[in-house]
């Protein structure tokens, strides 16, 4: 029989059932021929997942129901079906596109498709973006967000690293003209572009926080503790007052030195003298915190290169714990970060004499920053800078012990300041910080119990999530965590120590970024002969850190949105409403009636407005020898009794403006009853 006849007979014998069998066997044959089954499954799953994730991202970006859907799982059935159909459709489209590419059976098509799928794998996470960049979803769910971001960040890093490795293999050592052009551009601009990026970030930070903290102050939202305290100390310092006088806390007699050795105030004095108001300190703080980006960049550039260093410096200005500390009035620890990093850079670059000056300035910021500087010396010892590291540890450690244990207690009649923050670790029969150390060393079970508190777990998550805990990848990270561990985590029942809205985060910020730089540098080292992936490992972590910094800064920080940031004890109020502006004008009309050097006692939020004088007292502590009384109605419970007592004795109402009352000792009391009736 002719061959053509045989073909016709065979064709006629094909049934629909046989067609399905032939198609299935053809697909299996195609897959078996082109790639092993595990690789085929991985490739097709990745393609489907990327398509589905893009669908989820598109729906999330356009839908107005994302918040309710995330928080309550509430979504109308048609919308829910649309979401699933969209994800399946785009996932299926990506899958079919991959199969179509395979069917063409070009040379190395299977491997090329597999590499393409791996290169696209970071897009698996794109579907999360609409959820991560909606702050409403995560209100009161900070721990959930932190754990989610940390775990997702680790997975994202794995996908980025695999993607970079696949890209290298796909190029097979051949650089495209575009990549060569980009590489040449980055190299040509490396002398100026990275430092420009750092400068823009630092300038944006300084301007943003200067403006908003000043506005916050002018909305009467700063407090006697601690804005008024620090403003009064600086005013007395530049006017030749008693050593470290702080009248809002101690009254007419008393020195702040017993609580904190902030000798750095003498450095701030000349700047404060230019404009003797609390606003000067707020601007100074914002600028100093921003300037710390420069020594961090300079140090990092020596170890990981200029471009990566610029990204690390920008991550610093976006770091939420930095924002929280800056938003809470004015404090010294955030200022110390600049000098710790400057000391590190100067030692690292061989400028030892300048490093010693920077070290002394770091110690002068506050006594606890001297302890931090001593730990910096230990890091230098382990970083092959043994001699300068040993000097720094010895000098800074001796300074801390001498100032804290010898010089400061006499100013508090022999007591040790802030021991109450660790009081739970002082055993019966023990006393002072020696008792704390005895418990930490001799009773690890009790110490561990005090550490395992929900607030501390959340605190660590918020500190580490922007890095996916990368800072603790190597033992050096734990050495650098000693200051934060002692000054925050060991605290007992004092919540400000373990909240990112207080100044104590500086003990972590100063060292976690050093650990990040150290770990990134180590990633470049070959792990075995012929290991050429060090650059890929470093780049993968850099990309991960940048992405996580953006997410966490948006959620916890202050610069991208102003709904969730906290400063001090509560949510931070940005801007100045018309009501607050009017209240500011009213209180300053009354302040204008008070002589510049008259002794005045005021409500908590008014003290910072009048603390630039020799004696400005806090009403909730007492009247002391004040000549004037300035308070707001309705008065706080801890202020009302003193204000009422004053008006019932020898203070007379001078004037009222809105809810504010000004009274003077010995003044006519004819208006007192009107005010007293409102106070009952």
Model-inferred region functions:
Residues 295-298, 315, 326, 334-359:
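Specific aromatic-rich, kink-prone transmembrane helix
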Residues 82-84, 140-151, 478-531:
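Hydrophobic/aromatic-rich transmembrane helices and adjacent perimembrane loops
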Residues 312, 341-346, 353-367, 372-381:
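Membrane-interface alpha helices of multi-pass inner-membrane proteins
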Residues 181-186, 372-398:
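Perimembrane helix-loop-helix junctions
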Residues 95-105, 279-303:
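Transmembrane-helix motifs of polytopic, lipid-linked glycan transferases
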Residues 119-126, 196-202, 393-397, 523-561:
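Signature aromatic-anchored transmembrane alpha helix within multi-pass, membrane-resident enzymes
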Residues 208, 212, 386-473, 477-482, ...:
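Membrane-lumen/periplasm interface segments of specific transmembrane helices
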Residues 2-17, 21-52, 90-95, 106-126, ...:
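Start-transfer (signal-anchor) and selected internal transmembrane alpha helices
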């Amino acid at each position: 029989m002719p061959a053509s006849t045989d073909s016709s007979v065979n064709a006629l014998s094909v049934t629909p059932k046989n067609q399905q069998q032939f198609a299935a066997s053809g697909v299996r044959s195609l897959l078996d021929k082109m790639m092993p089954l595990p690789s085929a499954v991985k490739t097709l799953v990745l393609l489907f997942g990327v398509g589905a994730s893009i669908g989820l991202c598109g729906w999330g970006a356009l839908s107005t129901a994302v918040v309710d859907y995330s928080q309550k799982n509430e979504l109308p059935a048609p919308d829910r079906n649309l979401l699933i159909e969209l994800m399946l459709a785009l996932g299926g489209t990506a899958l079919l596109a991959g199969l179509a590419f395979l069917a063409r059976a070009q040379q190395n098509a299977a491997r090329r498709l597999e590499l393409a799928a791996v290169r696209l794998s970071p897009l698996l996470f794109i579907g999360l973006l609409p959820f991560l960049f909606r702050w409403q979803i995560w209100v009161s769910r900070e721990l959930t967000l932190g754990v989610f971001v940390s775990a997702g960040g680790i997975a994202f890093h794995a996908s980025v690293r695999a993607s970079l490795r696949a890209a290298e293999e796909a190029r097979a050592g051949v650089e495209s003209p575009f990549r060569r052009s980009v590489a040449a551009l980055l190299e040509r601009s490396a002398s100026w572009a990275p430092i420009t990026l750092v400068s823009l970030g630092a300038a944006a930070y300084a301007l943003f926080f200067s403006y908003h903290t000043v506005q916050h102050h002018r909305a009467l939202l700063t407090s006697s503790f601690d804005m008024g305290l620090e403003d009064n100390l600086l005013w007395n310092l530049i006017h030749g007052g008693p050593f470290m006088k702080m009248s809002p806390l101690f009254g007419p007699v008393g020195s702040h030195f017993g609580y904190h050795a902030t000798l750095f105030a003498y450095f701030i004095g000349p700047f404060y003298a230019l404009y003797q108001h609390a606003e000067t300190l707020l601007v100074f703080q914002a600028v100093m915190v921003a300037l710390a980006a420069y020594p961090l960049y300079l140090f990092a550039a020596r170890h990981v290169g200029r471009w990566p260093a610029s990204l690390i410096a920008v991550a610093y200005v976006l770091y939420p714990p930095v924002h929280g500390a800056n938003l809470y009035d004015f404090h010294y620890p955030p200022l110390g970060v600049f000098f710790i990093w400057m000391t590190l850079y100067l030692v690292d670059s061989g400028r030892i004499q300048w490093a010693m000056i920077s070290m002394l300035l770091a110690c002068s910021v506050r006594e606890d920053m001297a302890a931090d500087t001593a730990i910096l010396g230990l890091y230098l010892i382990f970083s092959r800078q043994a001699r300068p590291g040993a000097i720094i540890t010895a000098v800074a450690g001796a300074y801390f012990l001498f100032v804290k244990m010898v010089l400061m207690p006499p100013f508090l009649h022999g007591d040790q300041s802030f021991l109450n923050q660790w009081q739970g670790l002082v055993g019966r029969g023990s006393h002072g910080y020696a008792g704390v150390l005895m418990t930490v060393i001799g009773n690890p079970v009790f110490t561990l119990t005090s550490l395992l508190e929900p607030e501390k777990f959340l605190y660590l998550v918020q500190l580490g999530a922007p890095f996916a805990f990368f800072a603790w990848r190597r033992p050096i990270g734990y050495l650098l965590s000693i200051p934060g561990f002692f000054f925050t985590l060991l605290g007992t029942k004092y919540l400000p120590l373990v909240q990112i809205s207080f100044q104590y985060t500086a003990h972590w910020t100063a060292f976690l970024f050093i650990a990040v730089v150290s770990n990134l540098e180590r990633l470049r080292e070959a792990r075995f002969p012929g290991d050429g992936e060090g650059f890929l490992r470093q780049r993968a972590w850099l990309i991960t850190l940048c992405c996580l910094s953006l997410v966490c800064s948006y959620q916890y920080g202050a610069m991208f949105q102003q709904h969730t940031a906290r400063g001090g004890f509560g949510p931070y109020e940005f801007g100045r409403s018309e009501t607050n502006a009017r209240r500011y004008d009213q209180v300053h009309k009354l302040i204008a009636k008070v002589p510049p050097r008259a002794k005045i006692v005021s409500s908590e939020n008014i003290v910072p407005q009048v603390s630039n004088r020799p004696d400005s007292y806090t009403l909730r502590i007492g009247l002391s020898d004040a000549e004037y009384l300035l308070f707001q109605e309705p008065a706080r419970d801890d202020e009302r009794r003193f204000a009422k007592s004053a008006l019932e004795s020898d203070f007379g109402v001078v004037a009222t403006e809105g809810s504010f009352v000004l009274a003077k000792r010995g003044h006519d009391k004819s208006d007192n009853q009107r005010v007293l009736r409102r106070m009952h």
